Amino acid sequence: EPVQQTSSPRPIEEITVVGQQSLFRLRRLVIEKEDEVFAYFNANNSSNRMDIICGKRVATGTYVPRRVCEPRFLKNLRSYEARSWRRGFTTTSYSQQDLLFESKGDFDQLQSEINELMLSSEEFANILADYADLTDNYAAHRAAMFKKD
């Protein structure tokens, strides 16, 4: 008997198939999604001070650059304190902990804005959920690859 096709107003669901991927490729996907999260947040937050900026930084004692993402207000404070110290305006150099403590009010505002955007924007909430899935997947693959037997 012939099969009768009926048209359905229901949209076709999207199915994504992911095969085995290298750890490098998974890390690349995490970074791309992270960039998407920050771009969306930066476009929708209250001020440029709250923007999240990513770049490469080489830690003291190593030549290996690492990706570091931080809010603009923290980057600006670090630059200001470093300039003050180099010019002799202060005798104390600030540690990362000192900078974080001094920026507590700004971090509270940043967290509030992220939460507010997540609750008010389904798109942002979905981007964050995708990011969480990717980071969990990366962590699981990394743990499996480097597990001790």
Task: Locate predicted features.
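Amphipathic, hydrophobic secondary-structure cores in small proteins
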Residues: 72-79, 90
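Extracytoplasmic
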Residues: 12, 47-51, 64-66
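Extracellular/mature segments of secreted proteins
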Residues: 61-65, 76-81
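Primary mode marks residue(s) on the alpha4-beta5-alpha5 output face of response regulator receiver
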Residues: 21-32, 86-87, 91-149
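Short coil/loop "hinge" linkers that interrupt or connect long alpha-helical coiled-coils or helical hairpins
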Residues: 56-71
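Sec-dependent signal peptide cleavage junction
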Residues: 1-16
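N-terminal post-signal-peptidase region of extra-cytosolic proteins
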Residues: 34-41, 51-57
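N-terminal secretion/transport leader regions
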Residues: 12-21, 69
